[in-house]
Curated annotation (Swiss-Prot):
The lineage of its organism: Bacteria, Pseudomonadati, Pseudomonadota, Alphaproteobacteria, Acetobacterales. Catalyzes the dehydration of methylthioribulose-1-phosphate (MTRu-1-P) into 2,3-diketo-5-methylthiopentyl-1-phosphate (DK-MTP-1-P). Its EC number is 4.2.1.109. The keyword Transmembrane does not apply. SMART domains: Aldolase_II. GO terms for biological process: L-methionine salvage from methylthioadenosine; pentose catabolic process. It catalyses: 5-(methylsulfanyl)-D-ribulose 1-phosphate = 5-methylsulfanyl-2,3-dioxopentyl phosphate + H2O. This is Methylthioribulose-1-phosphate dehydratase. Pfam families: Aldolase_II. GO terms for molecular function: aldehyde-lyase activity; methylthioribulose 1-phosphate dehydratase activity; zinc ion binding. Pathway: Amino-acid biosynthesis; L-methionine biosynthesis via salvage pathway; L-methionine from S-methyl-5-thio-alpha-D-ribose 1-phosphate: step 2/6. Its cofactor is Zn(2+). Coiled coil: none annotated. Keywords: Amino-acid biosynthesis, Lyase, Metal-binding, Methionine biosynthesis, Zinc.
Length: 211
């Protein structure tokens, strides 16, 4: 029989996730992926809850108190806490992908500019050695399409537009003029995949500039 974590244990889990997200926020900031109050970061706490950044905080200067816990419907466990405006998109990933342990979202120059310059519904990534950074890919002779969705301030409508993509889960997706959403089994592996995606989009920007 599996016993539910008691308050002390639950608090320890949130504190651990907060330390991880504070550290990752600083690394993302060092890369220029989370300017001003941009981006949002989360990690799974339990089967039914996640730790996520508060709304409106700079991700490069996070403190433990900036990480709060919410249920998978986005409701904060503690009254008065205000999670990221995009909490619903994080919750969608955890609900659709039970193996996901972390979700990271940034606003890089490459992801923003590339998707505004091209109105296509996806970015083709082919022939890159770094594609092998993603699960199940063993050769550069691979072609994948990174989905791009039009940005929308209505999170319910945006989540509904994204939902069909999880029928065959992509390695991540991009919101047009906004940024990448990436996920992984834990915070470190999620960062690894975000880093690979950011590198690939930077390469695509350079290729198009050189044409």
């Amino acid at each position: 029989m599996t016993l539910a974590a008691g308050p002390a244990e639950a608090g320890d889990v949130l504190a651990s996730r907060a330390r991880e997200l504070v550290a990752i926020g600083a690394r993302m900031d060092a890369r220029g992926w989370v300017p001003a109050s941009a981006g949002n970061l989360s990690a799974r706490c339990t089967a039914d809850s996640i730790a996520i950044t508060r709304s409106g905080v700079h991700k490069g200067r996070l403190e433990a108190a900036d990480i709060i816990e919410v249920w998978l419907d986005g409701t904060p466990l503690r009254a008065g806490d205000r999670p990221s405006a995009e909490t619903q998109l994080h919750c969608q990933v955890y609900e659709r992908l039970p193996a996901a342990g972390a979700v990271l979202h940034g606003h890089s120059v490459a992801a923003t500019a590339l998707t505004l310059a091209d109105n296509s519904p996806g970015i083709v990534l082919e022939g890159y050695e770094i594609l092998k950074a993603f699960p199940g890919i063993a050769t550069h002779e691979t072609r994948i399409v990174l989905p791009v969705f039009d940005n929308d301030q209505d999170m319910r409508r945006l989540a509904a537009a994204i939902a069909p993509a999880f029928a065959a889960p992509p390695i991540g997706y991009v919101l047009r003029g906004h940024g990448i959403y990436a996920w992984g089994e834990d915070v470190e592996r999620c960062f690894w995949r975000l880093e690979a995606l950011e590198f690939l989009l930077s390469c695509e920007c350079e290729r198009r500039r050189m044409r």
